[in-house]
A protein has these predicted regions:
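Acidic, surface-exposed loops and disordered segments
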Residues: 1-182
Length: 182
């Protein structure tokens, strides 16, 4: 399957099966994240794998959006490691987003579904999992196999065309915008 097909087929899973994700697949997903480019190649990502019953019960105190997944990745970055620039203060958030996207696509290729979840309680995550203060927690990513009731949201295929989201040479509006006619 092409990367474009993976992107088109992947959807945010909100109905997971309790079936465990095999260690080999989990390792492949994590390895894909390690391939992600990061600003100045600093690699500030710090991924916590949450999968034991007690740890998942702790996760349920930190988000209501685990959706029954047997694995949850905490996506964070070390603020002392992330690249810095005077005009751009948060390269780490972009870095961890790219890492998360790489892992999400690798999971999809392996038949493992995922969901990017930003509805989290970072202070509670810190308390429950001993996350250092120097780590900025950006999101969690539940991983697992889809349940029999799994379906993409009705909004999944509703995408604005590039003619509405891509501009050439300026962000001017109207007929002179230079937007694609796709």
């Amino acid at each position: 399957m092409s990367v474009t097909d993976l992107m088109a087929n992947r959807y945010s899973e909100r109905r997971f099966s309790p079936t465990p994700v095999e260690d080999e697949k989990l390792q492949a997903i994590l390895a894909a994240g390690a391939l992600a480019p990061t600003a100045d190649n600093k690699q500030p990502q710090r991924i916590l794998v949450v999968r034991g019953d007690e740890a998942l019960a702790k996760m349920d105190k930190c988000t209501r959006c685990r959706f029954g997944a047997p694995v949850v990745l905490v996506l964070a970055y070390d603020m002392t490691v992330a690249a810095r620039h005077p005009d751009v203060t948060d390269f780490g958030t972009v870095d961890i987003a790219i890492v998360g996207d790489h892992m999400s696509l690798a999971a999809e290729e392996l038949g493992v579904h995922s969901c990017w979840v930003g509805l989290i309680d970072p202070p509670e995550l810190r308390r429950q999992f001993g996350i250092p203060q120097t780590y900025k927690i950006v999101a969690v990513m539940p991983l697992g196999y889809p349940s029999e009731r799994s379906r993409p949201s009705r909004l999944h295929r509703m995408r604005q065309g590039v003619q509405k989201t891509v501009f050439f040479d300026s962000y001017a509006t109207g007929e002179d915008s230079g937007a694609l006619d796709a």
